[in-house]
């Protein structure tokens, strides 16, 4: 199969969306498919492609107009390249203010598919008239797509509910994880690489891009409660983003002893990420952006990994948690929140028991096969979930083993690629038969 995979993404920066693009492209290429990834040209050069071709569309670095320019330019460039290479299908990342995927398909006669990592009407905070434009554009390009891939069943439900897209056209395919990159390593060796003491502390971590819906505030509030009982607990927050400065200020407002390795916003920084300073001098360490190769080292250094997703937007349409899959790949137990839109209950596994220190948290904290679930937006419950694992090293070890086994069985990018190809093969059967979704 020959595939064009078009996204508005800066491949020089590693975060959830770019990881998904690169890893899926690599997995499809490994399975013998001819993949061309098409993205805008940003200031920093993207990482060299691994097994797939990369084309970049000239970009205009004008604030508020970058995406609009890409939408306009991609209509020309993708059409031109598609007429030359004649891919079997055009696979577009979800867009907002455009119907470019539909137009290019009409101009070239090539079927197209859309991948939705979220549901824009649930996420955007814009005026009524702008939202009307978004919904009209999405109704056009979702409605005329041959298939719509969503990273969670909840997103598929929302697209069906709002736009009436037939359910047979909606194909939920969860994200994966690179099991070679995210694999267990010796915990003490990981700590030595980061400059951390091997013993004497309980390390609890989070990794990701700082969005308002990441829930790091809940973790920070829980940290204050944990430190009251376990003063040797240390919290390592790996990442950066638009919400970064707010989070460091919030941690300090809680009275936590904070260390910043580098700025937490999106500004480039040449400051080193490691070695980390002596944990005796901090309780919460914000690392800022770290090199890709260091992310698995950080995760492997932790006793417990966290994903404190809030409800609200996540509960409604959610997304597919990359970080939990990465934690699982490294064999680290997870404390997360029970959010249907992200499918955390499925990830953590069948609940075996419930435990709480008092009546208030009794029904809010549950133990699964690969971690602990708590209700969202509740720092007391999240702290209790952490305490369960802090107190029980053998439980942490068993959950970590279960997590890695689950990742190997359910979370590989090769499996995601196979499911994606299967969805596209259905498109080709429909095209050849002359049928159309109604």
Predicted regions and their residues:
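Conserved donor-binding/catalytic core segment of Leloir-type glycosyltransferases
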Residues: 4, 197-223, 236
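Nucleotide-activated donor-binding/catalytic signature segment of Leloir-type glycosyltransferases, i.e.
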Residues: 247-296, 351
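Membrane-proximal helix-turn-helix segments that form the acceptor-binding/catalytic region
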Residues: 76-83, 99, 103-107, 130-150
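Nucleotide-sugar donor phosphate/pyrophosphate-binding loop at the beta->alpha transition
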Residues: 69-73, 108-113, 121-141, 161
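Short His-centered aromatic/hydrophobic patch
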Residues: 92-97, 116
């Amino acid at each position: 199969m020959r595939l064009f995979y078009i996204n508005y993404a800066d491949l020089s920066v590693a975060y959830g969306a770019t990881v998904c693009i690169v890893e899926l492209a690599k997995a499809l290429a490994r399975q013998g498919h001819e993949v061309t990834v098409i993205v805008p040209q940003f200031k920093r050069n993207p990482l060299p492609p691994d097994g797939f071709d990369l084309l970049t569309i000239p970009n205009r670095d004008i604030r508020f107009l970058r995406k609009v320019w890409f939408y306009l330019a991609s209509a020309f460039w993708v059409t031109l390249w598609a007429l030359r290479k004649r891919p079997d299908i055009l696979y577009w990342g979800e867009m907002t203010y455009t119907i470019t995927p539909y137009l290019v398909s009409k101009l070239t006669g090539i079927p197209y598919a859309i991948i939705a990592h979220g549901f824009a009407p649930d996420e955007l905070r814009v005026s009524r008239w702008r939202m009307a434009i978004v919904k009209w554009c999405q109704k056009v390009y979702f409605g005329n797509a041959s298939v719509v891939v969503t990273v969670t069943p909840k997103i598929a439900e929302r697209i069906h509910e709002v736009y009436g897209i037939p359910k047979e056209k909606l194909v939920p395919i969860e994200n994966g994880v690179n099991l070679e990159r995210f694999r267990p390593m010796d915990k003490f060796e990981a700590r030595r690489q980061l400059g951390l003491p091997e013993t004497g502390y309980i390390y609890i971590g989070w990794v990701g891009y700082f969005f308002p819906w990441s829930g790091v505030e809940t973790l920070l509030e829980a940290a204050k409660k944990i430190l009251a009982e376990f003063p040797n607990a240390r919290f390592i927050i790996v990442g950066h983003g638009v919400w970064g400065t707010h989070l460091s200020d919030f941690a300090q407002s809680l009275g936590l002893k904070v260390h910043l390795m580098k700025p937490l916003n999106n500004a480039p920084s040449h400051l080193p990420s490691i070695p980390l300073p002596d944990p005796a001098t901090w309780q919460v360490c914000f690392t800022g952006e770290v090199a890709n190769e260091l992310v698995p080292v950080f995760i492997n250094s932790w006793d417990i990994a966290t994903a404190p997703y809030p409800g609200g937007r996540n509960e409604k349409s959610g997304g597919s948690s990359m970080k939990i899959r990465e934690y699982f790949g490294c064999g680290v137990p997870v404390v997360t929140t029970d959010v249907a839109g992200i499918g955390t209950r499925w990830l953590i596994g069948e609940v075996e028991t419930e435990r709480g220190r008092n009546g208030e948290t009794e029904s809010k904290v549950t133990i699964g096969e690969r971690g602990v679930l708590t209700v969202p937006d509740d720092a007391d419950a999240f702290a209790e979930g952490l305490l369960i694992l802090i107190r029980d090293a053998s439980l942490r070890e068993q959950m970590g083993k279960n997590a890695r086994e689950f990742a190997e069985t359910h979370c590989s990018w090769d499996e995601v690629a196979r499911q994606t190809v299967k969805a596209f093969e259905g498109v080709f059967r429909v095209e050849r038969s002359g049928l159309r979704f109604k």
